Every structure is written in structure tokens, then in C-alpha cells.
């Protein structure tokens, strides 16, 4: 009997010990999970706190969220935020804190373009994106004088500095062959359309002035031309528009029987005989160029020019093209087509996206250095951070992104 009681006591002792072990293990596990959950919340909050320190100027003026700082500065901020919360917690040993914006720096223009499009979509739904007012109305008192960027340090630090330029004239000439694709430029909601709305809202152009202080007057022209002066960018866009209009106008001349007959009569009068054919070609080119030159003047003065013309929207007769118009703009009888900003949209729509985004970032940097912070650099800005933390020998890793 005593032997049985002894065996039962031993068995109960074993069971009790096992239960105590399980209980202690559960208590330890709950404690570790509590620490893990608490650490997760603290580090997440610290990361969000870093993102909350976005550049207020860029957000207010351009709708973009950027954080500034190198890895050392960001890691220091993260450590400060974590230790502020954990400093009095004896059960938390913070062993490593690291934050890096390396994967999110705006050297990658795709990241910037992604955020621009996200902002444009939101702003469009809220009806916040509108074209800048025309320089002839709200803009006269705000319009800047023509400027040239001459600061060597500012020039070499531009985001587009290392991107090879592309020929804007060739781009414009190629658009003349895209008659069936022009409607795509103005299709609401497309990526190209959203980029155009963003650009026309936030940046000046020759005919319109955006809100806020800006270094260049011809900013949209800068996005297209990439030159360092207002005058040169205006000239590059002027050449591009004429290059677009010339083949379209030449095609109309040859498609219009009345104009073909006028060419024939004039060429026979100037060079009768075999040379008349060559003269006719030269006259047609002269006429098309004169009309193209007048088209650009019309656009600058606020008139509209159709992509493909008819007799009613044609402005210059053959005599006027040959004699020259002494700088006078000829307004056609029929007003229809696209205005200057819509022609800018055509060029922007077919422009290389990487180059376009880089030049948008150029302008943000130029304007920030001009009126906000003379040391501002896009190359020091990012749209997110990677976080690596070790607490109590456990690793925690996060990605935080706007």
C-alpha cells in the first residue's frame, strides 16, 4: 500500500513539474510575443515619424512627398525616435538601428513619376488641377523676366545633367505623321494626359503663369528643350512647332486644287518651261514655311491652329508668302483647332518619359534653391526608407514609402 502511495506521489510530482514547465514556457512565450509586438509597433511608429518630416516646400508647391537626408542622418533620427520610447524599458535591448533611403532616391526617375501620377490622379478627382492663368490676364504682374541659369554648381547637380538630350525637332516632325494618334493626347485619365495636367498646372509657359515663385518663365518649354535660358527654350519649341506644322501645311497645299493651280500659274510666270516644276516645288515649300511661321505667331497670340487645315483655316496666300509679311500675323477667317498649350501637350505626350520626369525634378530643384533653400538637392531626396533594427537579438526589417 505504501509502495502504491509512493508511486502516485512520484507520478503527481512529475505531472506537476511538467505543468509548471509548460506554464513557464507559455509565460516566456507570451512575454517574448509581447516584446516582439511592442517592438514592431515602436519601430513602425518611428519609421512613420521619419516620413512625417517630408519637405514642406516641395509638398506645398508641387504636391510631392520627399524626405531629405543621408543614411547616417536618417539612422540617427530613427534611433532617437526608438530610444525615446524604449529608454525606460529594461526588457528591451536595442542593439542596432539602421535607416537607408538608397533604394528610394530620386536618381530613379520612375519613383518620381509614380508619385507625380498618384498625386495627379488624386488632384484630378478633387478638381485641384487647372491650367495656369494666361499671362495676358492674371499673369502680367507675376510674369518673370527672361532668365538664364549660370551657376555651375547648380547646373551640374541637375537630375537631368547626365541624361543625353534628344532632338526635339525630330520628335515634332514624327508627330506630324501621327494624325490618327492626336486624340490620344487628350484622352482623360491616361498616363500621358495626367502628366500633362500636372505640368500645365504647376509650371509656367510662354503664355501662362503658375502660382508661386519660379526662376524660369518658360518652364514647360524647359521640360521640352532642356536649355538653360528662357530665350533658348522658347526658340527650341518654336523650331519644333514649325517642324511639326511644315509637312502638314505642305500636304494641304498639294491636296487643295486651288492652291496647286496657284503654284502652277506662279511657277510658269517665274520660270516658263522645264524649270517650272522645280520652281513649283520651291514655291510650295516657301508657302508652307510661311504658313508655319504664321501658325506659331497665332499660337503665341492666343489663337488656335487646327492640326490639319482646310481652306477656311488657311491664313496666307501665295503672294503674301513670296513677298513676306513684315512680321504681321495673319488671322484666318475660321478660328478652330488647338491652342498653344495644347500643342505643348502634343510634344509632351510623345516625349521620353524618363527625360520628362528628370526635367520636372530639375525645375523643382531650381525653384527650391531660388526661393527656399540654396542648398536643396534632389539627389539627397527620397520617397521612402528601408529600416533594419535588432532588439533582444531579434531582427526587424521594414519598408516605408510614401
Residue ranges and their predicted role:
Residues 2-76:
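Alpha-helical assembly-interface signal, strongest on the long, hydrophobic N-terminal helix that forms
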